[in-house]
């Protein structure tokens, strides 16, 4: 989002929702009423960054969380991929043609071809992986090499990206 500085701002109102694990906690509704200030969102933010920079980045991260109906917790936050996809289209003005693909339904060469096509078109890929026991992680693939090695942004403040 920061690389493309998109969207200029969210649209509509995200309805309030209740956390699944804590029925006493309700995430309030949010109306998108101001543009994102992309010039105040550097690629990297740390504890020494100015407060206004931290606030802008925090706003974007929170907005991405609520449009995905994220389940916020003390140790982790999670969301269903389907909710994230729906929220990106409905509230962040992403193309309605944006869709989900399942790797299990394709042969590997076809899968790599599809990933490269998206990346060549300058469309980073929101990717999810999970274990049979239900654990998982959502991350971004934003580049590749000719040998089908992909660059992954794991979403851990730059830790272990590559």
Protein language model annotation of sequence segments:
Residues 42, 48, 70-71:
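N-terminal leader/propeptide and maturation segments of large enzyme subunits in energy/redox metabolism
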Residues 1-44:
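Active-site nucleophile-adjacent alpha helix/oxyanion-hole segment immediately C-terminal to the catalytic cysteine
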Residues 155-162:
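Conserved catalytic-core surface of thiol
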Residues 3-5, 37, 77, 110, ...:
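Residues in intrinsically disordered, low-complexity segments of regulatory proteins
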Residues 1-4, 53-60, 66, 70-88:
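Active-site nucleophilic cysteine motif
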Residues 8-10, 63, 160:
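Intrinsically disordered, low-complexity segments enriched in small/polar residues
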Residues 86, 90-153:
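Active-site-adjacent substructure of cysteine-protease-like catalytic cores
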């Amino acid at each position: 989002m920061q690389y493309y500085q998109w969207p200029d701002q969210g649209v509509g109102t995200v309805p309030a929702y209740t956390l699944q694990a804590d029925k006493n906690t309700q995430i309030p509704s949010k109306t998108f009423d101001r543009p994102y200030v992309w010039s105040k969102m550097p690629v990297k933010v740390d504890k020494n960054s100015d407060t206004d920079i931290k606030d802008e980045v925090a706003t974007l991260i929170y907005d991405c969380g609520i449009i995905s109906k994220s389940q916020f917790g003390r140790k982790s936050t999670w969301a269903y991929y389907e909710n994230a996809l729906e929220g990106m289209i409905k509230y962040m003005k992403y193309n309605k043609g944006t869709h989900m693909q399942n790797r299990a339904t394709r042969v590997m060469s076809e899968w790599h071809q599809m990933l490269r096509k998206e990346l060549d078109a300058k469309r980073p890929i929101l990717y999810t992986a999970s274990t049979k026991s239900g654990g998982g992680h959502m991350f971004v693939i934003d580049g590749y090499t000719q040998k089908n090695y992909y660059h992954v942004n794991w979403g851990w403040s730059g830790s272990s990206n590559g």
